[in-house]
Regions:
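Structural recognition of an alpha-helix C-terminal capping motif at a helix-to-coil junction
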Residues: 35-42, 55-67
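A short pre-motif secondary-structure segment
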Residues: 142-143
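Arg/Lys-rich amphipathic alpha helix in sigma70-family domain 2
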Residues: 52, 66-85, 89-96, 180
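Amphipathic alpha-helical segment used for protein-protein interaction
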Residues: 101-139, 194-197, 201, 205
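Solvent-exposed, charged amphipathic helical/linker segments at domain boundaries
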Residues: 153, 158-159, 164-255
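Sigma70-family region 2
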Residues: 41-57, 71-78, 133, 181-185
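Low-complexity, glycine/alanine/valine/leucine- and proline-rich hydrophobic stretches
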Residues: 241-324
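A short, charge-rich alpha-helical start-of-domain segment used by transcription regulators
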Residues: 1-21, 31-37, 45
Length: 324
């Protein structure tokens, strides 16, 4: 390692977690955010010998990351409830949609030690990130830089490679568009009451017992449930119970195993589904099936975002690829 390489690593490595969060806010995708951070570090390393210290290394890295995200910007990512349709019938077949870019959760484990880089954990709630995706990419960047990261108007303009007046205009339009779009964010896992923690535990236990009636009792009466990449969503504890009875491949107690985790700062549960072992070892193996992110409002479990086909997300969360 050269002196320049060592200097680059010592100056930029501590910023990785917050840059990952920034790229996630911009992209709405945990897996894309990883790629965007890698591209950010590659560009920064190539340009480090030209860095003159006119701004802090942190501001410089955010400028690079922001422009990487703007260059890579695609169609906005959404959750099923954000598509604007009516609640679905739980008795109708569920069919995944590959025509929509779906929002992904971000496992907290990907952000490293909870005691470090607190800024990485600001503004990453699912409702907030979903609301951000509604904005044009440049407005999204302006809002994140000013209102989440608390950059100055001049720093924001520099990161966006535009004038202060233009950056302020983008910020004003973003604030007007987003309104209270993130107002229904749930309680963070670290702030749950004892009652809410108990409901979280009971949610996991009920699915492991295949106790659908128990799941219904745990949910708020008007709870909502979504399962990207399934485009439909469901309203009401009874409807959600019917969905679980008729559509879930688990049939008996023990088919599912649940591992509590945290995503986007919110309580979550990694769901593993029993499958015959394919390695000739005999017995059963439980494989990643679903990642449930829970929203608690006023002490009740009011919403579940259940992400299907979550193997990559399990890896980001530091969860095992299988259970035996």
């Amino acid at each position: 390692m050269t002196v320049v390489d060592a200097g680059f690593d010592s100056a930029t490595a501590p910023l990785r977690a917050e840059l990952l969060a920034h790229c996630y806010r911009m992209s709405g995708s945990a897996s894309d955010a990883e790629d965007l951070v890698q591209e950010t570090y590659l560009r920064a390393w190539k340009a480090f010998h030209r860095f003159e210290g006119r701004s802090s290394v942190r501001t410089w890295m955010y400028s690079i990351a922001t422009n990487v995200c703007l260059t890579a910007a695609t169609a906005r990512r959404v959750l099923p409830v954000g598509l604007g349709g009516e609640p679905s019938n739980p008795l109708e077949p569920v069919v995944p949609s590959t025509e929509v870019l779906w929002l992904q959760p971000l496992p907290d484990r990907a952000l490293g030690d909870p005691g470090e880089a607190a800024v990485a954990r600001e503004g990453i709630g699912l409702a907030m990130v979903a609301a951000l995706q509604v904005l044009p990419a440049k407005q999204r960047a302006a809002l994140i830089l000013r209102d989440v990261l608390e950059f100055s108007a001049a720093e924001t303009a520099a990161a966006l490679e535009t004038s202060v007046a233009s950056a302020n205009s983008a910020l004003q339009r973003a604030r007007a568009s987003i309104g209270d779009g993130a107002a229904q964010e749930g309680r963070r896992a670290a702030e749950l009451s004892d009652h809410e923690k108990q409901v979280w535990d009971e949610f996991c236990a009920a699915f492991e017992r295949h106790d659908i009636d128990g799941v219904v009792r745990i949910l708020a009466a008007d709870a909502t449930w979504e399962m990207p990449p399934i485009p439909g969503w469901y309203r009401g504890a009874e409807a959600i119970g019917e969905l679980s009875r008729t559509q879930c491949p688990a049939q008996v107690a023990g088919d599912l195993r649940m591992v509590p985790t945290v995503c986007n700062g919110l309580p979550a549960a990694a769901m593993y589904l029993r499958s015959p072992a394919a390695d000739g070892a005999g017995g059963d193996v439980w494989l990643p099936f679903q990642l449930d992110v829970l929203t608690f409002t006023d002490g009740e479990l009011t919403h579940v975002s259940a992400f299907l086909d979550p193997a990559d997300l399990f890896a980001l969360a530091g969860l095992p690829a299988e259970l035996r």
